[in-house]
Amino acid sequence: MLERLSWKRLVLELLLCCLPAFILGAFFGYLPWFLLASVTGLLIWHLWNLLRLSWWLWVDRSMTPPPGRGSWEPLLYGLHQMQLRNKKRRRELGNLIKRFRSGAESLPDAVVLTTEEGSIFWCNGLAQQILGLRWPEDNGQNILNLLRYPEFTQYLKTRDFSRPLNLVLNTVRHLEIRVMPYTHKQLLMVARDVTQMHQLEGARRNFFANVSHELRMPLTVLQGYLEMMDEQPLEGAVREKALHTMREQTQRMEGLVKQLLTLSKIEAAPTQLLNEKVDVPMMLRVVEREAQTLSQKKQTFTFEIDNALKVSGNEDQLRSAISNLVYNAVNHTPEGTHITVRWQRVPHGAEFSVEDNGPGIAPEHIPRLTERFYRVDKARSRQTGGSGLGLAIVKHAVNHHESRLNIESTVGKGTRFSFVIPERLIAKNSN
């Protein structure tokens, strides 16, 4: 086993080199000349090894150093071992960087590494999507030149990173940006897309505002009549009118609460529990009778039902979806409208549809029809007792059955609501 170079080895090498000079000098004389020749030969040998080492270090790409003898052998062997260790460390460091980048790419947030001045030296893929960065084209670019927002510039310049920055991109996307010091004079920037959270917060505010608004009017009516009764007793027709109005408003509030509870129940229901066998044809026969009663012969109906077509699902949710679509057609179409209800087999499953030849719905309203409390004609909806929750209930109910609500409408020609229950949920004995 080779050991490191020592003084003993160097002195021994020098003595061995000079030994022939001593022997020859003892026999022939001229000892100084023989010693000079020996030392010169040793020097030339060292210079030759130095040139070989320099060639290997600067020119030769081989990992193995040139073979060495004497004092050069442990030196060259040590250099070779050091190179192997460095290669191993570089490989380990490369693997560590790969794991770090792989982990950073898996993060659900955009990650950017910059210098203290803002020069980018790395970013993950999500940063390219969310912040619009390009890698490696933007390497070395100042992030303030790429994200030109005054509040972002001020946030970086003040150096107060105790709170995140909420930034709005292009009036649509909301970002939450956090900046943390990262090693010496470097910054770690994490950007999270919180657009959906802002939308949910807005929906929550609108929901409570709408519920408050819907309850305020019937409560105001009830309060008004109660105050009238306190001031003077009501008799005859006035009393009957007051009781009738209070009863209507109470029923309206009760209906609103029931629909809110139904919507909450559907949203909270587990989607995987679709194991009930639902007799949709029988359900539609009940809905047909109720629709005829609700219509009071103002509309005409055609029910085209495949009596053998049954599905697996949640019966309460499907009943809510089907009845809401049919009752909406009755409540929101004028007298003389013809309503066609179909339950039939289609190539990809079982389709339920409600079609009418009424006035239709303007295109700008269609994307918002399934929002809670959204109404196309608010005055007419309140007159018919509509709460604006029916289509929201339908949307969530059909989503739980791996489907989606389709709405097609042409102004002046009519509207068609439909959804398709997928093939896998059709009962096996359905033809």
From Swiss-Prot:
Protein's UniProt keywords contain 4Fe-4S: no
Domain PAS: 96-167
Keyword Membrane: yes
GO biological process, one term: cellular response to phosphate starvation
Record field: catalytic activity: ATP + protein L-histidine = ADP + protein N-phospho-L-histidine
Membrane topology category: Multi-pass membrane protein
Keywords noted in UniProt: ATP-binding, Cell inner membrane, Cell membrane, Kinase, Membrane, Nucleotide-binding, Phosphate transport, Phosphoprotein, Transferase, Transmembrane, Transmembrane helix, Transport, Two-component regulatory system
CDD domains: HATPase_EcPhoR-like (cd16952), HisKA (cd00082), PAS (cd00130)
Residue(s) carrying Phosphohistidine: 213
Listed transmembrane segments: 14-34, 39-59
UniProt topological domain (Periplasmic) ranges: 35-38
GO cellular component: plasma membrane
Boundaries of every Histidine kinase domain copy: 210-425
Gene3D superfamilies, per the entry: 1.10.287.130, Histidine kinase-like ATPase, C-terminal domain, PAS domain
Cytoplasmic side: 1-13, 60-431
GO MF annotation terms: ATP binding; phosphoprotein phosphatase activity; phosphorelay sensor kinase activity
Subcellular location, record wording: Cell inner membrane
EC number in record: 2.7.13.3
InterPro entries: 2-comp_sensor_kinase, HATPase_C_sf, His_kinase_dom, HisK_dim/P_dom, HisK_dim/P_sf, PAS, PAS-like_dom_sf, PAS_fold
Pfam families for this protein: HATPase_c, HisKA, PAS, PhoR
Role played: Member of the two-component regulatory system PhoR/PhoB involved in the phosphate regulon genes expression. PhoR may function as a membrane-associated protein kinase that phosphorylates PhoB in response to environmental signals.
Protein name: Phosphate regulon sensor protein PhoR
